[in-house]
């Protein structure tokens, strides 16, 4: 049995799809791509879910150069097994999920061809049914059952649909209903930076029909080489790009999406970036206005100031693990198992999901929620700046990714964390955080640091926050002495 497990990246499949200047070998070839299609068919058969007969599957791509070829290879397999394929062309990851929800599509499943913000020569697949995105164990099953299938052969057809137009109409209807206004953005100057990914539609298909002036929007054209900057709301160059555009054109707001539009961030009129903790704070304020005393789930590296902000707005902050699917699934679990509801689960990366939207991480939907509130606040004179004014910002925050050179890196890293916990207790005013869900979180005299094992790489990831200048350096000096005892730990990155 051939295994393709090396292509698994958590709940996604990712690989090299194009020849590249780094001479990295192609791993998403025709044979491996079509084997993945077979694996998905086997997963469908194993699930024994009640799909339509014949089954309908929608497939879309982001702007990557290899997307059309991969789609063609997948389609060839699915059609040969009697599965009707809806080719939706350029799409976003959230829109692909919605194709399983929209009654006019009735897709039993959907595949998004994307590799998020990775370099142009990568690509990959995300899978959905109406129940949501496939989990890690589902992807493992697909890749382990990709050789042959007993699924009956058949003959089917391909149709083409404009999913982005239908998805845009869905968002426009949502915004107009919530604001009770046909042109709720009239008088607002809003710039979009799509980074040449799939998010350029947001200008002409959503903002303009709602009355916004979008002069100065940039990099809207799909270009899989991403020639201007990486489409990534966490990337400094990308955030600087949209920030500069906002101030240059004297806009009221800037919006930036990642490649497949499941993440987003915004920029205020003065160029101030609202991503990471600020983005979470803004959406928490909006959510808690609608759902007081509800739970906000975040990942583990959010700031202490954010926790205070959520509490001050009447919410319960549940700081969980890194990994957007971990965060979203925790929100779902809380709703299933407790009497304290969760309406927002969001990671500092910009992946955020709302209960009202199928707990789907959808950057465009999150921006739509912000636009709805912006329209309402405008009438009462309230601004985003005022909403965020009470968010305490740390004086310093840093992340270090420390390579582990040991072949059994997870065991080695686990031992380091255990030893560190014992070591740190010998230092005055340092203590282990009482409530923590991953790695080791240490409370320091000026803030905290969290050290954890990377989800996918041989790394220790160290996040640090201090409320005073120089606090991180003092914490690092303590860590230098400790790390010096571990020869397979490359602590040069800390210097």
Regions found by a protein language model. Name each.
Residues 292-463, 468-495:
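Phosphate-binding and adjacent anionic-ligand microenvironments
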């Amino acid at each position: 049995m051939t295994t393709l497990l090396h292509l698994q990246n958590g709940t996604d499949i990712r690989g090299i799809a194009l020849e590249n200047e780094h001479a990295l070998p192609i791993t998403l070839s025709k044979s491996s791509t079509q084997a993945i299609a077979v694996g998905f068919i086997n997963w469908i058969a194993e699930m024994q879910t009640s799909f339509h007969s014949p089954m309908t599957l929608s497939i879309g791509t982001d702007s990557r150069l290899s997307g059309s070829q991969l789609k063609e290879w997948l389609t060839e397999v699915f059609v040969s097994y009697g599965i009707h394929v809806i080719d939706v062309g350029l799409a976003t990851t959230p829109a692909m999920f919605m194709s399983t929800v929209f009654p006019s599509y009735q897709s039993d499943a959907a595949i998004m061809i994307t590799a998020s913000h990775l370099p142009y020569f990568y690509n990959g697949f995300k899978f959905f049914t109406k129940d949501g995105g496939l989990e890690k164990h589902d992807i493992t099953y697909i890749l382990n059952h990709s050789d042959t299938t007993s699924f009956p052969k058949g003959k089917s057809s391909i149709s083409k649909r404009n999913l982005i137009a239908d998805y845009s109409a869905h968002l426009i209807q949502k915004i107009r209903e919530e604001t009770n206004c046909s042109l709720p953005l009239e008088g607002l100057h809003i710039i979009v930076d799509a980074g040449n990914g799939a998010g350029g539609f947001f200008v002409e298909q959503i903002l303009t029909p709602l009355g916004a002036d979008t002069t100065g929007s940039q990099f809207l054209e799909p270009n899989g080489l991403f020639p201007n900057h990486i489409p990534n709301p966490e990337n400094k160059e990308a955030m600087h790009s949209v920030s500069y555009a906002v101030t240059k054109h004297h806009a009221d707001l800037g919006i930036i999406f990642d490649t497949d539009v499941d993440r987003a961030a915004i920029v205020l009129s003065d160029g101030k970036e609202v991503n990471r903790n600020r983005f979470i704070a803004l959406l928490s304020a909006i959510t808690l206005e609608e759902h007081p005393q509800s739970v906000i789930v975040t990942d583990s590296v959010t700031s202490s100031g954010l926790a205070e902000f959520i509490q001050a707005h009447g919410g319960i902050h549940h700081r969980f693990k890194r990994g957007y699917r971990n965060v979203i699934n925790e929100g779902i679990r809380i709703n299933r198992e407790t009497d304290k509801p969760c309406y927002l689960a969001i990671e500092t990366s910009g992946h955020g999901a709302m209960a009202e939207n199928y707990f789907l991480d959808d950057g465009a939907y999150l921006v739509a929620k912000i636009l709805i509130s912006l329209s309402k606040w405008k009438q009462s004179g309230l601004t985003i700046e005022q909403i965020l004014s009470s968010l305490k910002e740390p004086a310093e925050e840093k992340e270090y990714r420390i390579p582990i050179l040991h072949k059994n890196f997870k065991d080695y890293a686990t031992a380091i964390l255990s030893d560190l916990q014992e070591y740190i207790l010998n230092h005055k005013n340092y203590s282990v955080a009482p409530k923590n869900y991953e790695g080791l979180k240490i409370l320091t005299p000026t803030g905290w640091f969290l050290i954890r094992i990377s989800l996918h790489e041989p790394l220790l990831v160290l996040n640090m926050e201090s409320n005073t200048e120089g606090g991180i350096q003092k914490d690092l000096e303590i860590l230098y002495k400790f790390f010096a005892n571990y020869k397979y730990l490359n602590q040069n990155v800390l210097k």
